[in-house]
């Protein structure tokens, strides 16, 4: 059980790092991008174009793209897929997914370092919370694929690894919850069985044994005793 929760915490920590990287793509930094296409570099909060002097010219930072957006040099947005620009508004699921994953990591750490790890209720809540976390990670990856198709860069592909990692954590949390519930049920059953047994003191057992031994030597009288017993007749003289 201890090793399993350690694995969950480790995987969630790695997943959190994977989900942070898309948030620091262009134009936040100029070294990472979700996708690159024809000198266009796309990030979570905008997009950039590399000019003739190899300098990136970016749009203002905001979630989602706009067909009227232009960079500082007047370039117009061009997506690598045929998706409508309005789909880019779904990129908002990235920070939401990061918040859920971070919360799930905190819950896993609490389970690992506190006695709440033996609580079926706490494990049930954490396992249930992992379900929307997994769905949000999966939605992030699907949105990235829908927008950028085969032009997805490695920070975007990390969302696939994050989705698989959260799926493994979700499965292990449900297994942990099942194991703890079974152990608690078996403990309650053993306590109930012990309480239902009659308890005798040593003196009571000894007294009962003595009564049993003495009764073995007692012979109950029968109706034949009167036939076997001799009759004594007094014969005398009457003066």
Curated annotation (Swiss-Prot):
Pfam families found in the cross-reference section: SUR7
Cellular component, GO annotation: cell division site; fungal-type vacuole lumen; growing cell tip; plasma membrane
Predominant place of localization: membrane
Residue intervals on the Extracellular side: 25-90, 150-155
Keywords on record: Cell membrane, Membrane, Transmembrane, Transmembrane helix
Domain of life of the organism encoding this protein: Eukaryota
Localization per Swiss-Prot or TrEMBL: Cell membrane
Signal peptide (from-to): none
Parts of the chain on the Cytoplasmic side: 1-3, 112-128, 177-239
Gene Ontology biological process: ascospore formation
Membrane topology, from the record: Multi-pass membrane protein
Residue spans crossing the bilayer: 4-24, 91-111, 129-149, 156-176
Function comment: Required for the proteolytic cleavage of the transcriptional repressor RIM101 in response to alkaline ambient pH, which is necessary for sporulation and invasive growth.
Family: Belongs to the palI/RIM9 family.
Protein name: pH-response regulator protein palI/RIM9
Species for this entry: Saccharomyces cerevisiae (strain ATCC 204508 / S288c)
Classification lineage: Eukaryota, Fungi, Dikarya, Ascomycota, Saccharomycotina
Gene giving rise to this polypeptide: RIM9
């Amino acid at each position: 059980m201890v090793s399993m929760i350690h694995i969950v915490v480790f995987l969630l920590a790695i997943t959190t790092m994977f989900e942070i990287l898309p948030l620091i793509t262009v134009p936040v930094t100029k070294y990472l991008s979700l996708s690159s296409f024809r000198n266009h570099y796309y990030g979570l909060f905008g997009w950039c174009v590399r000019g003739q002097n190899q300098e990136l010219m970016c749009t203002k930072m905001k979630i989602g793209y706009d067909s009227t957006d232009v960079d500082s040099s007047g370039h117009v947005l061009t997506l690598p897929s045929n998706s409508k620009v309005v789909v880019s508004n779904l990129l908002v699921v990235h920070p939401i997914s990061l918040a859920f994953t971070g919360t799930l990591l905190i819950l896993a750490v609490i389970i690992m370092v506190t006695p709440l790890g033996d609580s079926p209720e706490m494990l049930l809540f954490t396992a249930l919370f992992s379900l929307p976390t997994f769905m949000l990670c999966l939605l992030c990856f699907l949105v990235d694929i829908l927008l950028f198709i085969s032009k997805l860069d490695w920070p975007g592909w990390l969302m696939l690894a994050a989705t698989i990692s959260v799926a493994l954590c979700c499965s292990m949390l449900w297994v942990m919850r099942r194991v703890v519930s079974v152990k608690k049920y078996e403990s309650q059953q053993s306590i109930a069985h012990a309480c239902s047994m009659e308890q005798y003191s040593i003196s009571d057992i000894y007294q009962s044994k003595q009564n049993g031994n003495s009764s073995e030597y007692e012979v109950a009288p029968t109706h034949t005793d009167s036939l076997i017993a001799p009759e004594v007749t007094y014969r005398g003289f009457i003066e």
